[in-house]
């Protein structure tokens, strides 16, 4: 039973009576400080034991030490960082819920409180990017579709590169980091993704070969786990600790290998 306050015995009696269940099966689900306290609270109510008894299953004592340690770390961070999330759907934070939760989980793993600074990419320009991003510890540009806010994202990526601010580009964000590098480091002023500018003279991001000729694009993205070989001198290799990894993808465009040599050399 969801409740803001502990259930009095009389309330439990009434619930048991009208729900036709034993009183021992009326368990309170109190509000908790953080979501991840909920399993611990339910264990205190012996939920697992009650469920196992109903199903006539054995119910060994669970080892929740690691979970308790995680909850403690969540509520007692030893440091703080601010990460700018530069996107175009920021009015609806749930549009980036998986990114937000990943940042929070990464913070917990490092005893760090992560504050997200929401930045509307449509408002970012070469003139104000420093003012907007000078107070952040990291910059993240997530995925998205369409050309709205693209140049603002590229300005944020350039600012991160030029000021050695940790940067993570996801999906379109990663692709735009290639576009920014090609433009501002290599000198290909017209560099772009053919998804956004089909007539670009430097298509550093292009349609994957196996997607060419597909006119009905609904449900045709490359999906699922896909192998990736990491360069041994890369940050990714340092973090993964292995050369070949597998990650899930949902893409139709990728880095154009015709530009791989010049990108690596610069």
Please identify what each model-predicted range represents.
Residues 1-266:
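N-terminal beta1-alpha1 cap of cysteine-dependent amidohydrolase-like domains
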